[in-house]
Amino acid sequence: MVTFHTNHGDIVIKTFDDKAPETVKNFLDYCREGFYNNTIFHRVINGFMIQGGGFEPGMKQKATKEPIKNEANNGLKNTRGTLAMARTQAPHSATAQFFINVVDNDFLNFSGESLQGWGYCVFAEVVDGMDVVDKIKGVATGRSGMHQDVPKEDVIIESVTVSE
């Protein structure tokens, strides 16, 4: 279990080690190293998802490790409350950023090993704190430099606890 201690409350997450082993290992490594401490949910879209894991307050981007293989063909779906890896348009480009689905997002699911079909790898789910996620999804957002949908007031992951 992983707990994000945010300035809006705690979000408790259960990982799917058996379905996305490389992705879960990558995520837990970042958690244990303290990478996510004092990072923000930098992209919040009500009716879609909340994204974090890559920026500090002030939209300062963090350096990451090498990208990992996309394990989206694991049978898991991007349903409300699941966590998936964020990435660029390249299927195997995920590093540290993740998002929490606030609705079912079927269009993000794996449909085939093509550029459009790879989808986004689900690797965990919220088991407690969806009320916190729902609070976050409703914050006021705007533009920050080249970025859209950025909370006007920082939504901060203050610290992360990993319990085996």
Curated annotation (Swiss-Prot):
GO molecular function: peptidyl-prolyl cis-trans isomerase activity
EC number: 5.2.1.8
Keyword Cytoplasm included in the entry's annotation: yes
Location within or outside the cell: Cytoplasm
UniProt enzyme class: isomerase
Alphabetical list of Pfam families matching this protein: Pro_isomerase (PF00160)
Activity regulation statement: Inhibition by cyclosporin A with a Ki of 25 to 50 mu-mol, a concentration 1000-fold higher than that required for eukaryotic PPIases.
Keywords: Cytoplasm, Isomerase, Rotamase
Catalytic activities: [protein]-peptidylproline (omega=180) = [protein]-peptidylproline (omega=0)
Ribonucleoprotein recorded as keyword: no
UniProt superkingdom: Bacteria
GO cellular component, one term: cytosol
Biological process, per Gene Ontology: chaperone-mediated protein folding
Matches recorded under CDD domains: cyclophilin_EcCYP_like (cd01920)
InterPro entries, per database record: Cyclophilin-like_dom_sf (IPR029000), Cyclophilin-type_PPIase (IPR024936), Cyclophilin-type_PPIase_CS (IPR020892), Cyclophilin-type_PPIase_dom (IPR002130), E_coli_cyclophilin_A-like (IPR044665)
Listed PROSITE patterns: CSA_PPIASE_1, CSA_PPIASE_2
Residues covered by the PPIase cyclophilin-type domain: 1-162
Coiled-coil region list: none
Similarity-based family: Belongs to the cyclophilin-type PPIase family.
Summary of the function given for this chain in its UniProt record: PPIases accelerate the folding of proteins. It catalyzes the cis-trans isomerization of proline imidic peptide bonds in oligopeptides.
Name recorded for this polypeptide: Peptidyl-prolyl cis-trans isomerase B
Lineage of origin: Bacteria, Pseudomonadati, Pseudomonadota, Gammaproteobacteria, Enterobacterales
